[in-house]
Amino acid sequence: MKKDIIEFEDIIGRYFNLKINNQNYRIYVEEAGSGIPLICLHTAGSDGRQFRHILNDKKITDKYRVIVFDLPWHGKSNPP
């Protein structure tokens, strides 16, 4: 039997739009898993990629819905 050569990760990435004080923000978020929400906030000058290992950790995503977002001006999120 031929083994699959492509293996997809369970991470889902998408954008959401947020309006605060008449200012529009387009924020990129990735999530994986189900259960108790676990929100990961990246450090200054970085983006959500620093949590890639958590998003791919089955021991964590079996118990938690891991949510990672890029702050405005970081990663895939646009400036306001």
What residues fall within each predicted segment?
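Gly/Ser-rich "nucleophile elbow"/oxyanion-hole loop immediately N-terminal to the catalytic nucleophile
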Residues: P80
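Alpha/beta-hydrolase fold catalytic core
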Residues: M1-L38, T61-Y64
